[in-house]
């Protein structure tokens, strides 16, 4: 069985059950009102994982924070290797681009978005770890779907956005860890059931509306990029509230 847990609840859950596998996808500015900075969130997550030391951590290798500290748990990494190397820096307003070893600004050979990509530190040699599961080609992507190649197999999803391709890559990495056949992985990724606010489509009169929930600045940028892939014109409505965290907003 698989379960999605809030960032700080791993410490509570591992008191009662011993997971076999943790999956770490990313840490962005989702819930600063509850947990503080991204490094505080990461510390809380790792405390929970350490309580189940035999469980493997399957990490997004493109995220520098997941390679910043040693762990008692064995680790495996997934990530993108779909573009030729090109020296670059992340946007100046990007979080998490200081080397966790020496505080020098990280450089990149490839960036997918935000601070995710093939990073390295020119000062101390800190760099992205070797990837165990790799996305090697983006075949096609628009605002409603994407096709891509992971470890030599082509897969597709019926939702748009690079962030959803990352989710599919994480799911594929889990499936490969448990030796699930590619055909079954393909069928699972192709399953199309929209949930509330996650590119959910509803009818309003004779118009079709797509709802997209945004919870942090990186997510907002990604949704804007995704909308820019639409091959048609559309109207955009943005709804904003100033309530507290999940469950009230």
Q: Which residues does each PLM region occupy?
A:
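Glycine/threonine-rich flexible loop motifs
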Residues: 32-40, 247-248
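Active-site beta-alpha connecting loops in nucleotide-dependent enzymes
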Residues: 195, 213-249
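Single conserved hydrophobic/aromatic residue that forms the stacking wall/gate
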Residues: 1-9
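Short, polar loop motifs at secondary-structure junctions
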Residues: 10, 61-65
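Short, conserved loop/helix-junction motifs that constitute active-site signature segments
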Residues: 16-18, 48-53, 70-72, 230-232, ...
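A conserved, hydrophobic alpha-helical segment in the catalytic core
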Residues: 17-24, 116-129, 159-190
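Extended acidic/charged loop-beta regions that coordinate divalent cations
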Residues: 10-29, 69-154
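Gly/charged, well-structured mid-domain segments that form the phosphate/adenylate-handling core
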Residues: 140-143, 175-214
């Amino acid at each position: 069985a698989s379960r999605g847990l809030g960032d700080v609840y791993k410490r509570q859950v591992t008191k009662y059950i011993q997971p076999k596998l943790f999956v770490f996808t990313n840490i962005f500015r989702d819930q600063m009102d509850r947990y503080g900075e991204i490094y505080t969130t990461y510390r809380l997550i790792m405390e929970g994982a350490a309580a189940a030391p035999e469980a493997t951590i399957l990490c997004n290798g493109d995220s520098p924070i997941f390679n910043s500290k040693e762990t008692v748990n064995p680790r495996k990494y997934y990530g993108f290797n779909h573009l030729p190397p090109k020296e670059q820096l992340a946007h100046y307003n990007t979080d998490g681009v200081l080397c966790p070893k020496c505080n020098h600004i990280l450089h990149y050979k490839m960036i997918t978005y935000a601070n995710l990509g093939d990073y390295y530190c020119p000062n101390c040699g800190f760099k992205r770890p070797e990837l165990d599961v790799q996305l090697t080609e983006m075949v096609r992507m628009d605002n409603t779907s994407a096709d891509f190649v992971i470890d030599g197999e082509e897969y597709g999803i019926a939702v748009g956005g690079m962030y959803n391709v990352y989710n599919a890559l994480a799911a594929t990495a889990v499936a490969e860890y448990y030796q699930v056949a590619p055909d079954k992985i393909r069928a699972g990724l192709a399953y199309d059931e929209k949930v509330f606010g996650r590119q959910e489509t509803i009818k309003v009169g004779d118009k079709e509306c797509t709802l997209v929930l945004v919870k942090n600045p990186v997510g907002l940028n990604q949704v804007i990029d995704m909308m820019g892939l639409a091959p048609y014109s559309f109207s955009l409505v943005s709804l904003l509230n100033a309530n507290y965290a999940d469950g009230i907003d």
